[in-house]
Each structure stands twice: as structure tokens, then as C-alpha cells.
């Protein structure tokens, strides 16, 4: 919220830019595909760039929401849950806004480190296999998927 307010104070009126940006996004290739394609495609692209360890971490995060609300978790774990969980909510809001159609593997890169915090929630015995899965996934995507980056 602080960065948004800072930009507003500096003169950037996002509420004026949003409708124009929305219109520009829906020109071109985005107009060819239905919104549901982008809704699920964006999340799939994010899943590919984050890798399986993050998926596991987010799964653990989802199971710890109730203990978080009851303050039954240690402070470090609570901080990880809050940061990674907040970023997952930001991703959901960004996806629901329909403002990103394709290229989320580039546009959503700032979300990835925050989501990656969720890997700290994995049980210790899962961390080495999760790291191996991340490396294999990264190499497979880099070598088998054609991207323009």
C-alpha cells in the first residue's frame, strides 16, 4: 500500500491509467482468446516459472492458515506465512483483474521470490528432494520449452 500511495503523492494517478491500460491490453492477440484462457494460462505459466518446490510450499501454506489465525505458530513461520500468503493473494488479484495476458513469466517475476519463501515451510526431509526437483524442472523448461527470452 505504501508504494501505491507514494506514486499517488508523486502524481501518478493509477485510477486514470487503469482503464486506458485495460483497453490497450485487450487490443491485439488478447482479443482473439477468451478471458478464461488467460485466467488459467497465466496461473499455469506462473506454476512453470516457480517450480514444484514452490507448489509444495504453497500447499503447506494452505494447510497452515487456520493455525495462523489462532496465533499457534512460531514467529518465523508466521512471518513466512504472511509474506508468501499475501503475495499469493496479490497474484490472485492480478489474475482476476485480467490485466496480464501472456508474458506473465516476465511480468510476474517480482512475485516469484515472495512465493519462494513458502519453500521454507516444507518439512526438512523434503528440502533436498525439492531442490533437486527445482533444478531438474528449470533445466527441462530451459532446454525443452521455446521462449523468446
Regions found by a protein language model. Name each.
Residues 71-86, 124-132:
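Membrane-interfacial loop-to-transmembrane alpha-helix junctions, especially the N-terminal start
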Residues 75, 85-95, 101, 112:
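A C-terminal functional module that forms or caps the active site or interfaces directly
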Amino acid at each position: 500500500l505504501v508504494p501505491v500511495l507514494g506514486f499517488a503523492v508523486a502524481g501518478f494517478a493509477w485510477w486514470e491509467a487503469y482503464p486506458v491500460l485495460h483497453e490497450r491490453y485487450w487490443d491485439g492477440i488478447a482479443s482473439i482468446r477468451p478471458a478464461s484462457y488467460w485466467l488459467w494460462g497465466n496461473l499455469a505459466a506462473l506454476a512453470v516459472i516457480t517450480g514444484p518446490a514452490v507448489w509444495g510450499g504453497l500447499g503447506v501454506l494452505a494447510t497452515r492458515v487456520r493455525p495462523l489465525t489462532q496465533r499457534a505458530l512460531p514467529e518465523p513461520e508466521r512471518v513466512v506465512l504472511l509474506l508468501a500468503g499475501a503475495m499469493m493473494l496479490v497474484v490472485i488479484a492480478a489474475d482476476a483483474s485480467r490485466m496480464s495476458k501472456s508474458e506473465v513469466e516476465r511480468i510476474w517475476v517480482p512475485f516469484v521470490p515472495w512465493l519462494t519463501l513458502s519453500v521454507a515451510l516444507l518439512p526438512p526431509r523434503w528440502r533436498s528432494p525439492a531442490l533437486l526437483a527445482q533444478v531438474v524442472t528449470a533445466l527441462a523448461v530451459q532446454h525443452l520449452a521455446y521462449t523468446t527470452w
